[in-house]
């Protein structure tokens, strides 16, 4: 699984382990906030606790990046840390329905280094955000048997302006019901946003939203 994670540094096993661990340390807390499941499940947390826990998760990510050798080079840490985010906004935590394909579609996803990464499209997440009905493709690494996480790279109308020019990522645990909460407050930059030695997949054309997602992480230094 480590080799399949977004944001892998070429030729360095230790860096691959970091790419796997850093994103989970950073957003493991945040992912638990929205319960990412059936809309008939437990009620959403109140705004106060939601903001506190989201900000704690963001602070944990800053700490991990400041104390680790990668992905942010030491010379850039004072400039790039703390990471920049939009203010938390629960209007960007929206219910979604996953429509699974009868069989997975193998795709070759372009990356920041000019290579292609083999992945599988398992279905589409359909939802409404910003008053528009939209969808995002959900991917897994090629050859994945048991899905532990849906990888959702996306771009939107803030991309290249307030947010990173190559798009952002969401990691979403699967549910048994096909009902989800997509929380764009948890959207984060690929590691190549901070270090060009990493190889990061780009969002496919179908995952380029024609709506502003003013939530989640901003471009480095924005």
Language-model region placement:
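Acidic, glycine-rich flexible loop segments
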Residues: 152-188
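C-terminal motif of bacterial Sec signal peptides marking the signal peptidase cleavage site
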Residues: 35-37
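Bacterial signal peptide processing site
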Residues: 39-41
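Mid-length scaffold segments of soluble, non-membrane domains
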Residues: 102-165
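C-terminal partner/receptor-binding element of secreted or periplasmic proteins
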Residues: 194-222
């Amino acid at each position: 699984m480590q080799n399949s994670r977004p944001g892998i540094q070429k030729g360095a096993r230790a860096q691959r382990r970091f790419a796997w661990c850093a994103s989970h340390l950073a957003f493991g807390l945040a992912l638990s906030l929205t319960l990412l499941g059936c809309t008939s499940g437990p009620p959403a947390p109140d705004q106060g606790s939601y903001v506190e826990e989201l900000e704690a998760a963001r602070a944990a990510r800053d700490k991990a990046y400041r104390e680790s050798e990668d992905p942010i080079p030491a010379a850039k840490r004072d400039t790039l840390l703390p990471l920049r985010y939009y203010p938390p906004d629960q209007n960007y935590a929206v219910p979604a329905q996953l429509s699974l394909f009868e069989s997975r579609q193998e795709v070759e996803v372009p990356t920041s280094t000019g290579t292609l990464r083999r992945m599988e499209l398992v279905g589409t997440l359909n939802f409404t955000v910003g008053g528009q009905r939209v969808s995002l493709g959900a991917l897994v690494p090629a050859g994945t048997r048991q899905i532990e996480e849906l990888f959702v790279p996306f771009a939107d109308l803030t991309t290249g302006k307030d947010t990173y020019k190559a798009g952002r990522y969401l990691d979403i645990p699967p549910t048994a019901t096909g009902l989800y909460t997509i929380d764009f407050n948890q959207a984060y930059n690929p590691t190549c946003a901070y270090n060009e030695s990493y190889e990061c997949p780009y969002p496919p054309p179908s995952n380029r939203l024609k709506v502003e997602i003013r939530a989640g992480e901003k471009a480095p230094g924005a």
